[in-house]
Design a protein with these regions (language model features):
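Positively charged n-region of N-terminal signal peptides that target proteins for export
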Residues: 1-4
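Bacterial N-terminal signal peptides
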Residues: 6-15
Length: 358
């Protein structure tokens, strides 16, 4: 879903600051042969059209009650005139989303922020992860621990994310195809098995929490094929210490335009999945009373491994994890906490409340 939100608010910003005779920027193309380096690639890549820092995971409070969470910071570069002298021209736009899934209420609560970079209000550093957006902040300390602080009206999160493993580089050394054309790709790595600690403030109560998280980092300029109408993605922290990322990009009629993923085993060895190695199989659907969308909230990702086929059945923490952003000019989608045989993680389902317009 982070892809859809990134492109949605990018389109909103694209018309700002351009002039009729203006010269539009040319974005760099994502190509094979990536050489990802850290901590540099934890930081922003402002020359590319869009990127995100996407945290998800499962938390438990002091009574052992589960919560799901998502914190995502986006950076986008609108296609505006680079010679525009107007200080208010949006050369970079920052957007962030925070979501809490609470099975005790069976509801999602969410908050968001958006601002153009500059004026001391918003910005994303390039040397390391350090993103500021109004009163929200994401930063990586010298000890390698990420911290996200997202105070909001209905709830607040203050969480630290301590890496327990090295980054999982997806695709071909970080070059991750998302479509049939080679330029339909991103630079992409994940940081699974993050040790999460912090506080959740909800209904006026501050609760200590801990759990396991996942960070997805992607940046790109041309991501999806024009025939794409949606996608299904999962990031799973496996109970044995391994990690699994799988995705399918759908065309009209539900056919798979492209698919892929990564399995990192507990010994550190990796299996990189190609388009013919991954299938997404819906098992049970839930209809949203708000949008009427029919989501495959219980499904299987079927993968081909060297030792044979394996099925990962995804079960939602609860069904009603749809986020309806239509009132704010955003799409409706489903993104929620799920469990599987031998793991926990997050599933995103897009394009079920209407075809994506990218």
């Amino acid at each position: 879903m982070r892809r859809l939100l990134a492109w949605s608010f990018l389109v909103i910003g694209a018309g700002l600051g351009a002039t009729p005779a203006g010269r539009y920027i040319v974005y760099p193309t994502v190509t094979a042969g990536a050489d990802l380096r850290f901590p540099r690639d934890h930081g922003a890549h402002p020359e590319h059209r869009t990127e995100w820092w996407y945290f998800t995971g499962w938390l438990e409070d002091e009574q052992g009650k589960p919560l799901g969470f998502q914190i995502t910071f986006f950076r986008s570069r609108p296609a505006t005139d680079p010679d525009n002298p107007n200080a208010f021209a949006p050369n970079q736009i920052l957007f962030a989303y925070s979501v809490l899934s609470d099975p005790s209420t069976g509801k999602l609560i969410h908050e968001q922020r958006v601002a153009r970079a500059g004026f001391g209000l918003a910005g994303a550093a390039t040397a390391d992860a350090n993103v500021k957006l109004l009163d929200w902040q994401l930063e990586r300390g010298t000890d390698g621990v990420f911290r996200a602080r997202v105070p909001a009206g209905s709830f607040s999160l203050d969480l630290t994310f301590k890496p327990t493993q090295k980054a999982m580089v997806n695709g071909d050394q970080g070059y991750s195809r998302k479509g049939p054309k080679p330029e339909q790709a991103s630079y992409y790595y994940s940081m699974p098995q993050l040790a999460v600690r912090g506080t959740v403030v909800k209904d006026g109560r501050s609760v200590r929490v801990k759990g396991r998280g996942w960070l997805d980092r992607e940046w790109s300029s041309t991501l999806l094929d024009p025939k794409a109408v949606g996608w299904d993605w999962a990031g799973i922290n496996l109970a044995d210490g391994g990690a699994l990322m799988l995705f399918q990009v759908r065309g009209r009629g539900g056919d798979a335009l492209y698919a892929g993923g990564t399995l990192r085993r507990v010994d550190g060895s990796k299996v990189v999945f190609g388009p013919n190695d991954v299938r997404f199989v819906p098992r049970r659907r839930w209809r949203s009373p708000a949008t009427g969308a029919l989501y495959p909230v219980e499904a299987e990702f079927v993968v081909k491994l060297p030792e044979g086929e394996r099925r990962f059945t995804l079960i939602p923490l609860f069904d009603a994890q749809e986020l309806d952003g239509r009132a704010a000019g955003m799409p409706a989608y489903w993104e929620g906490a799920v469990s599987t045989n031998g793991g926990r993680g997050y599933l995103e389902l897009t394009g079920y409340a209407g075809d994506l317009k990218l």
